[in-house]
């Protein structure tokens, strides 16, 4: 047999502008003989807060497959345009994998309307300090209340982007200066690193408080993982969580402050081989997470119709919640590892720790998640070590 091709990793910026900056693609050649899955590319949007826009992999019997529910870059450039449907960068969390900072999920609070701009403004209060945060989201029902959604980095442009590649690994690094402009508790720098090799895609965000006051920060990610078989019924999920956050309804999705045990419910995804999704919209936050011996929280998405597995390992101890979003009529599962619970400053939580990390001036915190591919059929018969034992 001919030798497998020599793996080479490259980084290309010869791609369309999205958000005013060129998209970046990390790419490597398939190195194996086709028996096992391997990552091939990652496409990133530095002009849109380093959205992890697409990931592709070689899957045995299927060839190169897109792993995220996303659009074409040309379509993204048209949609991510700052227009009415892209308020505060909202289009970024409708596809690909938006990075979320300085909070993930929703902020709820008193709303006022700016008479000059028409913007809805939310008052966020932390330790007696209040700041006006742009409310960029509301539910679909008539009169649904406005809230802040998924942070303030969705449409951020990178201050600089660098790429590096060696024989089998490619990485992109982007730096974001995020002044509060009065809309957060301090100024921040965020450094994003995304690395690709055969077996892993790793995303790292490090936030540093560059202001002169302490602040709370939350970091998260919103990847829409595609089910290659195209059928939601084939999905099996593992999320090692004891509790689920109760919400007022699935339109607002505002937490009530109550945690519901998952044990014995259709939201119990603790079994090693994964559990099926309920036959209903899932838009739930799972908390009280159980780490493995290394201190990592390992979640898995399996697609039994494609012998496909995606292992999502949260490698920061500050990741306290995993949001799961899966509409009944779609073939994706958004699995979102994040620091904070929804509405982390809400009175409904009383004195509970809702996962926001306090940074004094000059302090930093890091969020890290790693993706790994596996084949459930092989995994089930013990040919691949389970992540808890690696």
How does the language model describe each region?
Residues 5-204, 210-216, 223-390:
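Surface-exposed acidic/polar loop and edge beta-strand patches at domain peripheries
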């Amino acid at each position: 047999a001919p030798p497998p091709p020599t793996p080479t990793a490259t980084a290309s910026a010869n791609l369309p502008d999205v958000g005013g900056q060129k998209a970046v693609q990390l790419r490597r050649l398939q190195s194996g003989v086709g028996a096992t899955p391997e990552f091939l590319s990652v496409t990133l949007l530095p002009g849109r807060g380093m959205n992890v826009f697409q990931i592709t992999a070689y899957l045995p019997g299927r060839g190169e497959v897109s792993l995220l529910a996303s659009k074409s870059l040309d379509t993204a450039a048209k949609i991510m345009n700052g227009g009415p449907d892209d308020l505060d960068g909202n289009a970024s969390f409708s596809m690909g994998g938006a990075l979320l900072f300085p909070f993930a999920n929703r902020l709820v609070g008193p709303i006022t309307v700016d008479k000059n701009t028409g913007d809805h403004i939310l008052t966020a209060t932390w330790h007696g300090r209040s700041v006006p945060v742009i409310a960029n989201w509301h539910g679909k029902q008539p009169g649904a209340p406005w809230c802040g959604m998924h942070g303030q980095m969705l449409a951020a442009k990178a201050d600089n982007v660098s790429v590096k590649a060696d024989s089998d690994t490619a990485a992109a690094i982007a730096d974001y200066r995020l002044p509060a402009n009065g809309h957060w508790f301090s100024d921040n720098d965020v450094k994003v690193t995304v690395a690709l090799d055969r077996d892993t895609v790793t995303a790292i965000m490090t936030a540093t408080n560059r202001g002169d006051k302490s602040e709370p920060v939350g970091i998260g990610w919103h990847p829409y993982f595609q089910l290659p078989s195209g059928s939601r019924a084939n999905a099996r999920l593992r999320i090692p969580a004891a509790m689920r956050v109760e919400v007022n309804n699935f339109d607002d999705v505002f937490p009530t402050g109550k945690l519901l045990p998952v044990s014995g419910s259709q939201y119990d995804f603790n079994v090693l081989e994964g559990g099926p999704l309920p036959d209903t919209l899932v838009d739930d936050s799972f908390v009280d997470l159980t780490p493995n011996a290394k201190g990592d929280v390992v979640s898995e998405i399996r697609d039994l119709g494609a012998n496909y597995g995606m292992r999502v390992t949260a490698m920061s101890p500050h990741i306290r919640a995993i949001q799961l979003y899966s509409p009944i009529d779609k073939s994706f599962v958004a699995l979102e590892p994040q620091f904070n619970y929804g509405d982390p400053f809400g009175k409904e939580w009383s004195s509970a720790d809702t996962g926001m990390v306090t940074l004094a001036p000059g302090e930093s915190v890091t969020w890290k998640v790693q993706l790994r591919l596996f084949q459930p059929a092989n995994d089930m018969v013990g040919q691949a070590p389970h992540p808890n034992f690696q």
